[in-house]
């Protein structure tokens, strides 16, 4: 009597700066097949709202890519792109496409000048393309403007008395009032950008579709756990600059509450992407959701996991942050709920017991004495090697 083939599901995130989620999954699958050639292996690339989210959902739903003009964090014109699922009228984009760290060189990082204006431009492009729903991943940001730039792109006017603020985050300390775009709740179908970073064409009447902001962190906008104090230093903000930015975003939240009648500063995820979560909720009526939850729905992970025997996940670095909404922890929890064994294949791993105990076993690609450069260059080979070890242990 022949036994049924073991069914294996591989659902990793990307290894940041190295391979995509699909490439990670394919290399793990290749290693497994060397030892287990007759087993059934399913691949479901994953993301958690950070960079790679649009690729994963576009891949799963067989979408296409739309290119558009936008501006980077420092106001330079770029060719951006977002995914579009025609039969669902669904656009999927990442804020990092316009306002990400990858758009600026290390010596250009300036969180006072960096703006999310280009993100607003991309939102308007998707609306003009016919999107009835927009998912936007909040990760990899170079900005800390609380969505100030997005608001300006949509036609909101940020004023000190009768003088319009030009776009630098520090100017928000002088903010006294916010005017709605054009006619009440009108939006621009096409943005215009001048050298002084101001909207130069009046917005036209247009209703926003449903917008879901997919976040991989739950930080509020302000305070010790807020956008500026937690993530500002990673973007080059000094202690003095952090205090200034905190005051600026506090003023923004106060005036939004006064003039728009909403106050999302304490909402989980408001601090994501330099406070863009707050801005999208305030200016677009967006819903903040766990990026992992958004992705598992889009790729239908639960139904794909129900019939497998065990699950493999992974990411570049397994540490305490993994437990805060990252892909491996989400996959592990879902696997446990469904009674599946779950393994992790990762680039690096903390020795923290709380992190490791959610997996049946953790396989690490890097080895003692191996430089980060070597482990990055050899990552495909090392993934296959660890996958062979995993297969032999089954």
Where are these regions (language model features)?
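N-terminal loops that bind phosphate or other acidic moieties
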Residues: 2-138, 142-394
């Amino acid at each position: 009597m022949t036994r049924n083939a073991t069914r294996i599901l591989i659902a990793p995130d990307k290894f940041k700066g190295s391979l995509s989620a699909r490439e990670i999954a394919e290399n793990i699958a290749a290693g497994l097949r060397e030892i287990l050639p007759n087993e059934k292996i399913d691949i479901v690339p994953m993301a958690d709202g950070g960079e790679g989210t649009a690729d994963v959902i576009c891949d799963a739903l067989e979408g296409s890519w739309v290119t558009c003009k936008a501006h980077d964090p420092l106001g330079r014109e770029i060719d951006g792109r977002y995914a579009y699922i025609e039969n669902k009228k669904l656009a999927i984009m990442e804020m990092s496409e316009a306002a990400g760290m990858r758009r600026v060189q290390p010596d250009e990082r300036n969180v006072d000048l960096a703006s999310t204006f280009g993100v607003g431009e991309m939102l308007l492009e998707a609306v003009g393309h016919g999107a009835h729903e927009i998912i936007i991943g909040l990760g990899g940001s170079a900005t800390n403007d609380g969505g100030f730039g997005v608001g300006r792109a949509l036609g909101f006017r940020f004023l000190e008395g009768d003088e319009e603020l030009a776009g630098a985050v520090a100017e928000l300390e002088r903010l006294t009032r916010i005017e709605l775009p054009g006619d009440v709740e009108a939006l621009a179908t096409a943005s215009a950008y001048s050298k002084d970073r101001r909207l130069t064409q009046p917005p036209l009447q247009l209703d926003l579709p449903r917008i879901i902001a997919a976040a991989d962190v739950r930080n509020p906008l302000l305070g010790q756990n807020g956008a500026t104090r937690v993530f500002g230093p990673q973007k080059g903000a000094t202690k003095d600059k952090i205090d200034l930015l905190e005051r600026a975003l506090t003023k923004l939240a106060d005036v939004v509450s006064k003039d728009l009648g909403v106050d999302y500063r304490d909402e989980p995820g408001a601090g994501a992407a330099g406070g863009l979560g707050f801005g999208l909720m305030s200016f677009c009526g967006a819903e903040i959701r766990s990026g992992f939850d958004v992705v598992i729905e889009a790729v239908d992970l639960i139904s794909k996991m129900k019939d497998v025997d065990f699950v493999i996940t992974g990411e570049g670095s397994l540490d305490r942050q993994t437990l805060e909404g990252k892909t491996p922890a989400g996959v592990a929890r879902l696997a446990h709920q469904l009674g599946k064994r779950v393994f992790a294949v990762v680039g690096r791993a903390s020795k923290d017991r709380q992190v490791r105990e959610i997996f049946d076993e953790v396989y690490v690609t890097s080895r003692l004495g191996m430089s980060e450069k070597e482990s990055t260059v050899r990552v495909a080979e090392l993934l296959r090697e660890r996958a062979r070890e995993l297969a032999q242990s089954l």
